Each structure stands twice: as C-alpha cells, then as structure tokens.
Amino acid sequence: MHIKPIIQGVVARSAHPYGCEQAVLQQIQYVKQANPIKSGPKRVLILGASSGFGLAARIALTFGGAQADTIGVSFERAPSETQTGSAGYYNNLFFKQHAEQAGRIAVNLEGDVFSVDMREQVIEAIETYFEGEVDLIIYSIASGMRRKPRSEKADPEFWRSAIKPIGEAVSGATLLLENDTWIETTLQPASEEEIEGTLRVMGGDDWENWIDTLINAESLAEGCKTIAFSYMGPDVTHPIYLDGTLGRAKIDLHQTSHALNLKLANFDGGAYAVVCKALVTKASVFIPGLSPYLLALYQVMKNKGTHEGCIEQMQRLFSDKLYGHSRIPLDSERLIRMDDWEMNPDTQVQVRERLQQMNASNFQQLGDYAGFKREFMQLNGFEFDQIDYSQSVDMHNFINKK
C-alpha cells in the first residue's frame, strides 16, 4: 500500500508505520543524551500510553535514566488490508519492540480505559509482570466519550465531552491543516449537559476510580506516586480553555489530585496535577482559538531557545521535578508547573504582540505555521526526512500484530 497523508480539517485519516517508528526513535535518542532521571520509578502504569504526553512519559522513563518497565493502556485502531489504522497503534508496536530490545518489559493493553474489564486486565498484568505492585501511575486520557457505569445507566449511555465556552459565545480562529487556511469561528456556550459530560470524561473522576481500584487490589508500592496532565495558559486562551468546559474539567482534575494525595500519604507517596506547556497534539488542534496562540508561542519560544515538545517536557518533569530531589517543587495550588518557560513574562509579552497583529493573510509569517504543521504531520508518521514515502508498505507486517 502507498500511504499518503489524508487530512480532513484537523483530523488525520492515515498514518505511516515507519514514520511513526521514526518519531519513537527520535524521542528515544533525545532522552538518551538528556539530563538523566535519577532514583526514578521501576514499574510504571500509563493510562493513555499511545501518543502525546503519555507516550513521551513512557519513553522518558524507559530510556531516559530510570530504566522503567511499563504497562501501557490505550484504545487504537488496528490496520487492515485497506486502512492504515491509527498512529497510536504503531507507536505502541514500535515502542514495545525497542523497549524489549533494550531488555525492558513493555506490556500493551488495548481497550476501553473506562471499563471494569480493563481494570481487571491491568491488575492481572501488574501481578504477572510487576510482582503485584506499581511505583507510578500516569493518567493521560484524551477521549471524546465515556460509557456510564452500570450504576448510572441512563439514556444516553455515554457521557460526551464538548470543547465549548461557558456562559457566553466565544469567537476565535481555527487553522484548517488540510488546506492551510485560517477560519474565523464562533462557539456557542455549552449546555449544562455538555458541561457535565466534559467533566465526567476529562475531569478527575476516572483517575480517582483507577487509584481506588489499585488501592483495593493492593497494587500500590511504598512511595507510589500518580500524576495527571493539565493546562492553564495565559489570559488570551482563558475564554475557550480555562473558563470553558475544558477548564472546568481540569480544575476538577486539580481538586482530585489533592484528594488522591491524602490517600497516597498512607503509602508515603503523592498525587500531582502537572500543568504542561501548550503543544501540538492530536487533542490540542481540536481546540478552536488555540491554534493562533500556538503559532505565536512556537515562534517566540524557538527564537528564545526555550521551546519544548512532549518528550522534552516529560524528561524535564521526571529528572528536574518529580524524582531525584528531596522536595517536589509545587506552586501555591500544589501544582507542578511545566509551563514555567511558556508563562515567562517576556515570552508572553512577545506572544501577545504577535497575536494582536496576526490574521488570515499573515499567520504563516508571524507565527511558526511551518513548524506547527510539520509537528502535526509527524504525529502521524509523515514529513520525516529519513523515510522514503514513495515506497509501498506491506500492511501484512502490521495486521494482527500486538
């Protein structure tokens, strides 16, 4: 099969297997030469392990000094004779291959992270591969929906997340990657049902359920930590993000971290929400109004030499903040701030200046659109110089592989 990029709006409909491997390899190469993680965790569970921060965390902990064994949970689309499947499928496959070559355990579990069945599979895997205990649980789920538990069965049977403002409509620009155009959009405010749905899918509810399940199964090691990822951003992004449905869910996540921290104190451990920097991920390109900010931010931070991708963020999180130090640096709300370089005052002044001038005719010049789009393409295995995209790919090498 000849695999070409297929983009509809901001969604990639194809993925290149060997390009995805290249993305994994580049992240492995980065962490091997970076400041190493000291006194890191040895047995790690990653819920949402196939892309973005979850995948980067898995790579950093395996290859960046901690030499961790990992169990990764994700929900990805497998390839067929006619379809390439999703990038996350190949990320999982190639991560496992390279981790095992390095002598590490890498277990991939495919399925619905919200389900009771997956909790049972994970506990069984912890018993089998980790002698019954984990040292770190990473919660990195970006999902559009969550099946309601049996106890709350109602119509409809799913909670659905909606990226919308709360209270009043918000206007902003979205970049359509399929034809490189700037589209002005207005988002109507969320209904109460949409606010509740987003809170249930993207908030701390399921994270807490997972930790409770693992405590009850006696699967937490002494000193066990758990983290989940959040974003806050500057004022310019607040109407659509922090003040909207996503922000409501993230604040719930922060509150959950405090409740879980009390529970993990019994294990001499801790729970933390990690506020990351704004990045191009499969999830972030969906957020209307965020793309122009990302373009300006990328341009300014690259000019200053402070730009980080997911892998740089995760390596710095584990080596500089979470492990190897007597105290974990927290802000006044007990959050770990990995957006510290993004929120640098001078950086934000320069970003705001660019944003005020940015429009449909100049966004490619004022912002780092080339870098933004290249990063998006590389999430799906495209635009790597090392890959010959004219070569046909034999999909039989990947169908039914685990």
UniProtKB/Swiss-Prot annotation:
Q: What class of enzyme is it?
A: oxidoreductase
Q: Spell out the subunit comment.
A: Monomer.
Cite a single GO MF annotation. Answer: enoyl-[acyl-carrier-protein] reductase (NADH) activity
**Could you say which residues are annotated as the site Plays an important role in discriminating NADH against NADPH?**
E76
Gene3D superfamilies xrefs: NAD(P)-binding Rossmann-like Domain
Query: What InterPro entries is this protein classified in?
Result: Eno_Rdtase_FAD-bd_dom, Enoyl-CoA_Rdtase_cat_dom, FabV-like_NADH_b, NAD(P)-bd_dom_sf, Trans-2-enoyl-CoA_reductase
Active site, renumbered: Y241 (proton donor)
Q: Where does substrate bind?
A: Y231
EC nos: 1.3.1.9
This protein is called: Enoyl-[acyl-carrier-protein] reductase [NADH] 2
- The positions annotated for binding NAD(+) are 48-53, 75-76, 112-113, 141-142, 250, 279-281
According to UniProt, this protein's pathway is: Lipid metabolism; fatty acid biosynthesis
- Any idea which UniProt keywords this protein has? Fatty acid biosynthesis, Fatty acid metabolism, Lipid biosynthesis, Lipid metabolism, NAD, Oxidoreductase
* Organism of this sequence: Vibrio cholerae serotype O1 (strain ATCC 39315 / El Tor Inaba N16961)
What gene does this protein come from?
Answer: fabV2
Catalyzes what? a 2,3-saturated acyl-[ACP] + NAD(+) = a (2E)-enoyl-[ACP] + NADH + H(+)
Q: In its UniProt record, which GO terms are filed under biological process?
A: fatty acid biosynthetic process
